[in-house]
Amino acid sequence: MPMQGAQRKLLGSLNSTPTATSNPGLAANHTGAPCLEVSIPDGLFLSLGLVSLVENVLVVAAIAKNRNLHSSMYYFICCLALSDLLVSGSNMLETAIILLLEAGTLATRASVVQQLHNTIDVLTCSSMLCSLCFLGAIAVDRYISIFYALRYHSIMTLPRAQRAIAAIWVASVLSSTLFITYYDHAAVLLCLVVFFLAMLVLMAVLYVHMLARACQHAQGIIRLHNRQLPAHKGFGLRGAATLTILLGIFFLCWGPFFLHLTLVVFCPQHLTCNCIFKNFKVFLTLIICNTIIDPLIYAFRSQELRRTLKEVLLCSSWPGCWAEGGGDSVWPGSCVTLRGPLPP
């Protein structure tokens, strides 16, 4: 985790950001031209990470406690929360270590710091890949639940979901290890960018198709009850707005980071690109914000999960609560295949 002044890095190998200034404003590039640089205070960054950490821990605990949530749909949501938890946790850990090194509180050998840096980079990269994969997996699961509703439980069985989850985690760890090892190859960065674009296209295609089917279904109900067409148009507008918010948040939170990686490949020395590189920490902050928003979109919309979450919060102040909960606190146990929240 080598430092240059106040610079901090998520994937230190992938970040070619020049030394950052301590205050927001206009920084000068090599020609003296003004360059907008937004500074994110470490306290704000750590606070957002802590909010994400607590939020996703609650999601994992709620799903683990309630056997009614032990279905493939909620397993994917649980793994998304776990990967988001690791994203925020690894960023908080790296920031804390950097602050301790800068303050001279943490003194250790350079080789130990470098090994720690590499370990955190692998953890961060693998958790980011997992987060993207599980967002795609949730979209696929919801697509199957709508277009193959009668065969959903025979297609999306629990063993298949568990194998898919295991494959995602293993592939993400192996891929991130290779990415960090061969960070100086442009192909590595391009693979990450292509992977992000593939997930974006997959989610867009599936959710747009689901929205179209929902509109057709609503139109059929309207015709059946001889209602007026404007009601159908209103439903379509609400669905389109929900879809825009869903994909818009995903793109706005993840897009700048992968834009950064793209520019590192194609214009590492260009003055305009260097101005963008100076805002690398802003891009990381947007990813942390996404880990805060994910539970609001995918988890907390479920009434069953919200009810269990209240029980978890009550149990935190009642020591014997989990023990008295009977079989509900066992993981994974037998499950009731519950399809979960409807698509947006």
From Swiss-Prot:
Extracellular side: 1-37, 94-118, 184-191, 267-279
Single annotated GO MF: melanocyte-stimulating hormone receptor activity
GO BP, sorted A to Z: adenylate cyclase-activating G protein-coupled receptor signaling pathway
Location(s), subcellular: Cell membrane
UniProt-listed InterPro entries: GPCR_Rhodpsn, GPCR_Rhodpsn_7TM, Melcrt_ACTH_rcpt, MSH_rcpt
Lipidation (S-palmitoyl cysteine): C315
Residues carrying covalently attached carbohydrate according to the record: N29
Keywords: Cell membrane, G-protein coupled receptor, Glycoprotein, Lipoprotein, Membrane, Palmitate, Receptor, Transducer, Transmembrane, Transmembrane helix
Cytoplasmic side: 64-72, 141-163, 212-240, 301-344
Its job: Receptor for MSH (alpha, beta and gamma) and ACTH. The activity of this receptor is mediated by G proteins which activate adenylate cyclase. Mediates melanogenesis, the production of eumelanin (black/brown) and phaeomelanin (red/yellow), via regulation of cAMP signaling in melanocytes.
UniProt protein name: Melanocyte-stimulating hormone receptor
